[in-house]
Structure formats: C-alpha cells, structure tokens
Amino acid sequence: MIKITLPDGSIREFAQGVTPMEVAKNISEGFARNVISASFNGTTIETETPLTTDGNLILYTWNDAEGKKAFWHSTSHVMAQALEELYPGIKLTLGPAIANGFYYDVDFEDQKISEADFKKIEDRILEIARGKFDFKMRPVTKAEALEMYKDNVYKTELISNLEDGTITFCDHATFTDLCRGGHIPNTGIIKAVKIMSVAGAYWRGDEKNKQLTRVYGTSFPKQKDLTEYLELLEEAKRRDHRKLGKELELFAFSQKVGQGLPLWLPKGAALRDRLEQFLKRAQKKAGYEQVVSPHIGQKELYVTSGHYAKYGADSFQPIHTPAEGEEFLLKPMNCPHHCEIYNVRPWSYKDLPKRYAEFGTVYRYEQSGELHGLTRVRGFTQDDAHIFCTPEQLDEEFKKVIDLVLYVFGSLGFENFTAQISLRDQEDREKYIGTDENWEKAENAIINAAKDKGLNTVVEYGEAAFYGPKLDFMVKDALGRQWQLGTIQVDYNLPERFELTYKGADNELHRPVMIHRAPFGSMERFIAILLEHTAGNFPLWLMPEQAIILSLSEKYENYAKKVLDLLENHEIRALIDNRNETIGKKIRDAEMQKIPFMLIVGEEEEKNGTISIRRHGQEGKGNITVSIEEFASIVDEEIKKTLKVFTV
C-alpha cells in the first residue's frame, strides 16, 4: 500500500499503481468527472499515470490554473496534428500553453497561412477532438527519438540537448509529438476552439535563426466559455490603455524621441505626480527617506552588483569617456546606487533600519518587437525603495512593507489578488547567487511574514530573482486578467557584494539584510494596468480633472469663473468649457473625457449661487442642484471612502 497526501492534509491509503483518476473517484464520482490533470510531488502528470510511492497529490479541474495549462497544452498537440494534415511537409517545433491559450511554432517552408485559413484549421481540430483519443505518454531512447525526427532539424536540436532516459513521446490518434507530459485524459474534452492569430517568431527567440510562423489559439470545454472569452477580448480592446491614453490625452510616443520612450502629457504628468505624492506621504509616515541617484553609473558598479552579468545583453551599450577611458551604463536598476548611498558613512545597529526611497528612472534595451504601450518600455520609473536592517528586524520590516502594499491596492480599487511566494528552482541552483544558508533564511522570512499577514498565497519554484526570493502580488483586474504588480524581495547577496556593514551591540561589524520593494512596480506599467482596470474612470482623488463647468451660454462665463475660484478654494480640480457649443455637445465631450462631475451653470444657478450636477456615466438619472459648499462635501465624502489614511 502507498500513502497519498491530498491538499487538505488528509492521507489515504491505496494499492501501489493507483492512478490519480482512481484517487479522484475515491473522493467523489462527481469530482472525478471534472478532473483533467494532476501533479505528484510537484511534477505534472497525466490522470492515468500509476503512482508507486508515497507522496503529495493535487488533482486539477478546468477551474484551476494548472488544469487550464494542461487543457491548452493538449489542444496545441491537436492543432499540430491538424496543421500537419492540412499542410503536408511542414516542420513542427514547440507548442506550449500560455496565458489564455497556446501556440505552436511551425516552419511552413514555402507554404502560406492566413486568417482565411483559420476556420478550416478550427474545424479539423474539433473533428479530431470528437474522436475522444486518449493522450498517452511513452518513454523512448535518444536513438529512437532522433530516428523519429531525422527530417526535422528543430526537434533534432531539442533531442540532442536531452539526456538518454529522460525523453518521452505523447501519442493521440495517429499523431506523435516530443513532449515532457501534462495532458488532459482525452481529446473529447475539447469542445470549442479558436485560432486567434499568426505571427513571426525566431527559432529559440534568436533573431540569427530562421523566422518561423507562430500560430496562436485558445480552447474551452464549453462553447459558452469561448463566447464569453471573445466578448471579454472585445471589452479589453475598448479598455486598451494605448487607446484610452490617447483619448484622455495622458501620454504619447514619438518616433523622433524613440520607441519605448513615453512622453507624458500634462494630464498624464498630473496623474503620475498625484500617484507619487500619494505614495510619498505614506512612505514618510512609515519612516522612509527620499534619495535621488543619477541616470547613469560606471559599468563596474553593475559588475559588482551582478546586474551586468545577468542583464548586460538587455542593457544599452556602454557610454565611453574618451579623456578618462571610463565606461558608463544607463542605469538598469536603482539598488546598486542605494547600496552606495548606504556606504557613505558607518552605521550602528541603533541606526537601523535605514529606508531609502526613490522614484528612479531605469533603462532596458527591450527588443522593438517586445515593446507594448506602457507595459513594456525602454525607459521606466520605479517606485523603488531599499531597506537595510539587522537580521533580527527582517520579519517585522517585511510585514510593514506588506501593510504598505495592501494600503496602495485598497486605495486604488485592486481588491482581488494573490500573493505569490517566488522561490528558487531546487533543481537548478547554479543560476542563483548567494549561499544556501542565506537563501533559506530569506525564503523562511517571506513565508512567515505572508502567513502572519493572512495573505492568500501560492508558491512558485523557479520564479525567484537571481539574488533572492520575493513576494509578488498577482492582481486580478476588472476583466479577470492577472497582473504582477507590487513586489517585495529579500536580499543577503548585495550587502556581501558591496561590503555593507553596521556595528553590532557586540562592537563587531555585521552585514545588514536588504529588502527591495516597489508597490507599483513601475509607474508606466502600473498606470497602464490601472487605466484598463478602471476603463479610465480613476478614483475621484486621482482624477486629473474632477469637475468641468459647463455654461449654458456666454452670458454666464463670469459666474462660471466665480464657481471655478470657489472650487479651487476647496482644492477641487476643475476647468471651464466656455466654447461656443451647445450644452449637449459639451456634455458629450466631457463624457468622452471621463470627467466625474459636470457642473452646469445658467440663469437659475447664477441667481441662486448654485450649480447643477450631472455625474459621468449616469445619463437619464437627472441632475441635482446644490451650493458650492454642498458639492465640496460630496467630493470630500467620496474621496474619504476610497482614500484611507495610512497608519503605521
């Protein structure tokens, strides 16, 4: 008998060779009907894989991220079969699951594929799926695998890099593919499919290699799910931050300035400034000190930190100074500069923690094909801070940072999130720097802090930064999409590299621990996500313009100006639309600009010293007439509901 531990901690005994599906049926027949994938001791397996040892078993349904991953990966196999049948002679390469679907990179050689072909590919995929063919894994020798793919240079290259005894094929119907595993039970579960697009993609992501065709698709267990997903995509297009940023006059790009380098227009700059001031106020209460570092640094600085070895290829080329023979880099990270700020003077344990904060702009050489609006740029500003503390202070400092992140999210309407504990890949420790002892200390500090704060957590191995583990906040937006926003990282490595010290109570020198944190991540990316999450209807306290005064005619311009002065006295951000347009046209334009309050002034309002309020997005609900003081109270109350006071 073997002992199987389930996620709820319960342990059940089964005969050796029991399959995950049999375990699922032992739990509940109804539950088993929905199980489509499993993992055993952290390794993804099929539901019919025999279990021969004690271990931890997780069973996945379509509602689980791992279940969707297996579903989409399996569909990529079926799509590959359909493509081979429809386009004989093509060469298949790789076909992984990705967020919201899958892709397969294919060498079509002289054949062409276009949007006009999508329907026939979808039809063939569904035709194969209806056959209810089982996905079956089987081990093969390296020689057998190479023989199978002797005419496919791409698969041959992949196989050549694998060790004998680790190679497996996946079969379904008459189709075979090189694969590590992780499939649904059979093709019959696939009920709806959509080919989304095709694009060029270099083999292995290297532009020196041949350009292949990447075929993107998605699939679902019900047609209804696909229909809802496509409707969601249409809504996402309407909320696209690039579209809204242009319409709301927040930011722009210029080919003369350069790709991936956003220009912030007055309204966007005001929005950024308001976010910065919001965080600075909270940070001041939490004991942070503002610092400023230059946009460039000597190459040797980033060699010392390890960033040059890790990110050198993603940095802009060094800047050379002819006279001194020095090499400078555009700053890729702020942390080395903050280490040098710490090193300016000696510290005692009584001085710690030191908390340095900076809205520091950094630069990365992103490939032009990877640039995307504000979410992937070449120059971006991080709300960076670094805390230098004693090992004894680490747990408490980490918890305080969590409190700050939760305050930021709560004030901006991000209520649905998961805290991802990102740890080392236990099988590939060479890609990380630092000692095992320090890594274990750092990982335990994060796990304990997240537990103490009652966060909803998931653990992801292999997602740690190269210098330390981290806590990533995975936020769901209004469309249900998941984004990685705030991050907190523990680092024992940089204090070693920069020889940071403090004098302890024992009068000896010790190394501080370093915490990296950025609740926004970057201003650019955060604003892009916030823009799409709110569809441009930002919280009232954040809006560049909270109200617009619409005069019914030129006769009431002076009263409109008087109203504006009174609003400014109440610190309400407003402007006047005094164009020679109809009130209907002015209202439509204000609606397009998503200004929260339209204040209409005419004869009655001037006579009574009032304003008529129309709320954005509430057409047909009627206006209310109030005094300026009453309106100021309405604004103040609404802001208080969303913008809480940060307490430490």
From Swiss-Prot:
Instruction: List required co-factors.
Output: Zn(2+)
* Cited SUPFAM superfamilies: Class II aaRS ABD-related, Class II aaRS and biotin synthetases, TGS-like, ThrRS/AlaRS common domain
**Catalytic activity line of the entry:** tRNA(Thr) + L-threonine + ATP = L-threonyl-tRNA(Thr) + AMP + diphosphate + H(+)
List GO molecular-function terms, semicolon-separated: ATP binding; metal ion binding; threonine-tRNA ligase activity; tRNA binding
Cellular compartments annotated: Cytoplasm
A Gene Ontology biological process annotation? threonyl-tRNA aminoacylation
Pfam families (UniProt xref): HGTP_anticodon, TGS, tRNA-synt_2b, tRNA_SAD
State the free-text cofactor note.
Answer: Binds 1 zinc ion per subunit.
Region annotation Catalytic: residue ranges? 240-539
Organism lineage string: Bacteria, Pseudomonadati, Bacteroidota, Flavobacteriia, Flavobacteriales
- Its name, as the record gives it, is Threonine--tRNA ligase
